[in-house]
């Protein structure tokens, strides 16, 4: 059974049923990639811009918030800075990694693009999963 661990640090995420939304996006992404029968694990954080800014500074040396960040698991880390993570091995890679989404940035961007907020968050979750 695929597992999604969701941590919501900002209660505003609950307005779009964040846990169900990101879980569904993850399952559908795996299914479309042909991995529907394999066990995978992922962690998703719903945070605010302040937390995302700290994460972006810590991991990317950028002192600003962003909409989504993703980190492949240690087993799949790139060997050379800037390279893509190692290709997914369905028989070995159970833990894919972590994703974080920033509420204010996602809301601001969805408004800017005249896109439904929940749909935009789902899109960004898929984007994050594909980076793993």
Protein language model annotation of sequence segments:
Residues 1-122, 130:
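An acidic/histidine-cluster motif and surrounding catalytic segment
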